[in-house]
Curated annotation (Swiss-Prot):
Coiled coil: none
Catalytic activity annotation: tRNA(Asn) + L-asparagine + ATP = L-asparaginyl-tRNA(Asn) + AMP + diphosphate + H(+)
UniProt xrefs under Pfam families: tRNA-synt_2, tRNA_anti-codon
InterPro entries in the record: Aa-tRNA-synt_II, aa-tRNA-synth_II, aa-tRNA-synth_II/BPL/LPL, Asn-tRNA-ligase, Asp/Asn-tRNA-synth_IIb, NA-bd_OB-fold, NA-bd_OB_tRNA
Native species: Streptococcus thermophilus (strain ATCC BAA-250 / LMG 18311)
Gene Ontology MF: a single term: transferase activity
Taxonomy, superkingdom: Bacteria
Enzyme superclass (EC): ligase
SUPFAM superfamilies assigned to the protein according to its UniProt record, in alphabetical order: Class II aaRS and biotin synthetases, Nucleic acid-binding proteins
Disulfide cross-links: none
Protein's name according to its UniProt entry: Asparagine--tRNA ligase
Amino acid sequence: MSKQLVSIIDVPKHIGEEITIGAWVANKSGKGKIAFLQLRDGTAFFQGVAFKPNFIEKFGEEEGLEKFDTIKHLSQETSIYVTGMVKEDERSKFGYELDITDIEVIGKSQDYPITPKEHGTDFLMDNRHLWLRSRKQMAIQQIRNAIIYATYDFFDKNGFIKFDSPILSSNAAEDSTELFETDYFGTPAFLSQSGQLYLEAGAMALGRVFDFGPVFRAEKSKTRRHLTEFWMMDAEYSFLSHDESLDLQEAYVKALIQGAIDRAPQALEILERDVDLLKKYIAEPFKRVSYDEAIDLLQAHENDEDTDYEHLEHGDDFGSPHETWISNYFGVPTFVVNYPASFKAFYMKPVPGNPERVLCADLLAPEGYGEIIGGSMREDDYDALVAKMEELGMDRSEYEFYLDLRKYGSVPHGGFGIGIERMVTFVAGTKHIREAIPFPRMLHRIKP
């Protein structure tokens, strides 16, 4: 049997040709003289059909019956080489199918644990290494891949340089209570929460930089939106205003959505994602509303029949129900800007004339997906940043390199970060972030 293989995703290019596919058996059915195989190879799913008379005619009765019997008894996830003629078939949901003419078993599969029946979440997570083979899980990972590809493409086209920040650090970029600590040859070190502080150094050297890699948050949160290890893209840029930063973030998110539509259309179809709705998010401008305007809206509607969130005063932080209501109210991704300085990071620059608010923005995704981007302008004045750190009782010695950036040619600069898994969850339309990463790390899960 020829081993010049064709990927399932490329099968439509070979209508009327005999091809060979390397695949796994996702499922099988049939009776009597016919057998149906659901095949997958990592690029797509496809159906093959085997007819007993055709095998007898080609190989003779003894060998033909033996091969057909092999097909009928293939177990789930057996790996095979399968050869056949690609034929158009309107009855098939693919529009075509493979008329199987030969088969070779590569690797047998016995007692595969994830059968077509329903399984509980814990069971599926315990078998995550196998669950990834399922139709929907494969589709989610294809969307993840499309979003990562679109990330690199977007920043390359916009003049950014990939800049790698360290995973191990002696300081915290965000909340120091959420750090994973480790021993670094007798000195305390921490797994990175964000590459932002180092990216600011990169922006002072290279103008526009971004990084993409794993970050770690020791949050004891057990929600559908939290992971303890996830992949983050951080971007930093010099000589860009707050409004220009929001424009860039909006263009980036739209590029990610378009990238998924262009590169993973079959995956979106498998997940039954409303592509017209995704296209709406691309076509319409994102809404921008200030924190105080958002609080006013929440207070005005808190007694509405369909609302389900707690009362907030100006100065309170949003919870997930508030974020959901805000984004659903506007119906498109929504920037909430200028939050109170009291619960935002020390490095954020105050709003001119209003030191109680900072030049920052969170992008809230509609359909209940909540925050997907957080960003701000950074305090570029040395004395102001030192005063803020002293006000918060921070140890300046841990941030000397960061303060140096304000001493030697400081400029207006800002940046933002996006958790890729949250973006994947939003674009894919899935319910839980654990499915947006191959092997999720959560509060009570560190394996497989």
